[in-house]
Amino acid sequence: MSNIIKQIEDEQMKQDVPAFRPGDSVEVKVWVVEGSKKRLQAFEGVVIAIRNRGLHSAFTVRKISNGEGVERVFQTHSPVIDSIAVKRRGAVRKAKLYYLRERTGKSARIKERLS
């Protein structure tokens, strides 16, 4: 039974997901349905958490919009996601960057990874 489930999950997984880590700045383009119209909406911010669970993988992106912190959790292999683009590589030493929630201004900056 588990082989059938694994086979179905493998078929549903996206192959074009770029490699990114916590601390990286990414731009996620998401399909949004408004009434009968369908359009792309970009959400750009810093990846603060990644949850690796195969087909059920997810990542959290945080940005500051009009002085207010906004976080959004995306399912990595969701058909709603059109594309993920890595804008900047960040150098951090933790897997979960939840401490950025309390920080503002210069203390919330992340150094750029050179490699």
From Swiss-Prot:
InterPro entries: Ribosomal_bL19, Ribosomal_bL19_CS, Ribosomal_bL19_sf, Translation_prot_SH3-like_sf
Gene3D superfamilies, per the entry: 2.30.30.790
Covalent S-S links between cysteines: none
Keyword Ribonucleoprotein tagged: yes
SUPFAM superfamilies linked: Translation proteins SH3-like domain
Superkingdom of source: Bacteria
A GO cellular-component term linked to this record: cytosolic large ribosomal subunit
Listed Pfam families: Ribosomal_L19
Keywords: Ribonucleoprotein, Ribosomal protein
Gene Ontology molecular functions: structural constituent of ribosome
Any single biological process term in GO: translation
Role played: This protein is located at the 30S-50S ribosomal subunit interface and may play a role in the structure and function of the aminoacyl-tRNA binding site.
Annotated PANTHER family: LARGE RIBOSOMAL SUBUNIT PROTEIN BL19M (PTHR15680:SF9), RIBOSOMAL PROTEIN L19 (PTHR15680)
Family recorded in the similarity comment: Belongs to the bacterial ribosomal protein bL19 family.
Name the record gives this protein: Large ribosomal subunit protein bL19
Organism: Pectobacterium atrosepticum (strain SCRI 1043 / ATCC BAA-672) (Erwinia carotovora subsp. atroseptica)
